[in-house]
């Protein structure tokens, strides 16, 4: 089975868990097509991330003329589906903190993705995260593309349920992944009981390479290391207090 993975920026320094997830699926025999909405804003240092760059299609690498031409092509070929996707993009745009124009831009990207998927014969799209990648995947499905799913990490999605149209994304998705039982409990609150079975938990983990490292000797003085982005979602100041 061929599946498309859609991320806002991929590969990226903070997205190694997505790279490992893709590698694990490929080890099980799946074929994964990587799609990134745009290029990473930061330089890559990990050799595996650098290698992923050559395997990834960046949807916004196309010039403006090509993007507009592809959008018009989708409109002409299936105006009813395009109208449905346009309505969804407009609805998301009026709610969104990013505004209508940004969400209409997601529709343009979805048209580009729709064309790429048709040529690659992908049967499903999985997006990380529940924000704009899930919006593009949803619009692509409304345009006639394959069904989609997405992974919700939180807490950003839970803090902006209305603004990112999270309920509608859950309703239209074939399934939704939470990375913890708590995350699943928050998603269950946003959908009908009949949809609860499609909310599943897939936890983030480390790979065998990490587990094969010899344990270091125990130092005389505690030496604590925290690796993570310095943003409010990570709660770094709470870790220091703890």
Question: PLM features: residue spans?
Answer:
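Short hydrophobic "strand-cap" motifs at the C-terminus of beta-strands
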Residues: 6, 153, 179, 202, ...
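A structural motif in glycosyltransferase catalytic domains
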Residues: 18, 25, 224, 239-240
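A conserved catalytic-core segment of Leloir-type glycosyltransferases
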Residues: 34-103
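A conserved, positively charged/aromatic
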Residues: 98, 148-174
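An aromatic- and histidine-rich active-site surface loop
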Residues: 99-115, 122-143
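Carbohydrate-associated surface elements
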Residues: 182, 205
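Conserved donor-binding/catalytic core segment of Leloir-type glycosyltransferases
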Residues: 206, 212-234, 240
């Amino acid at each position: 089975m061929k599946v498309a993975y859609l991320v806002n920026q991929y590969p990226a320094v903070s997205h190694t868990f997505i790279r490992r997830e893709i590698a694990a699926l490929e080890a099980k025999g799946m074929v994964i097509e990587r799609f990134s909405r745009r290029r990473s804003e930061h330089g890559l240092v990990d050799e595996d991330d650098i290698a992923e760059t050559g395997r990834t299609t960046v949807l916004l690498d196309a010039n403006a003329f090509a993007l507009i031409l592809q959008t018009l092509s989708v409109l002409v070929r299936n105006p009813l589906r395009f109208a449905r996707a346009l309505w969804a993009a407009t609805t998301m745009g009026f709610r969104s903190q990013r505004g209508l124009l940004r969400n209409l831009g997601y529709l343009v990207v979805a048209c580009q993705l729709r064309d790429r998927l048709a040529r690659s014969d992908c049967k499903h799209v999985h997006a990380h995260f529940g924000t704009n990648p899930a919006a593009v995947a949803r619009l692509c499905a409304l345009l006639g593309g394959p069904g989609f799913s997405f992974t919700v990490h939180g807490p950003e999605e839970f803090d902006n349920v209305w603004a990112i149209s999270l309920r509608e994304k859950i309703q239209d998705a074939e399934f939704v992944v939470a990375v913890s039982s708590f995350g699943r409990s928050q998603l269950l609150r946003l959908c009908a009981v009949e949809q609860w079975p499609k909310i599943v938990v897939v936890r983030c983990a480390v790979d065998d390479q990490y587990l094969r490292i010899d344990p270091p000797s125990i130092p005389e003085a505690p030496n604590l290391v925290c690796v993570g982005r310095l943003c409010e979602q990570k709660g770094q100041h709470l870790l220091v207090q703890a």
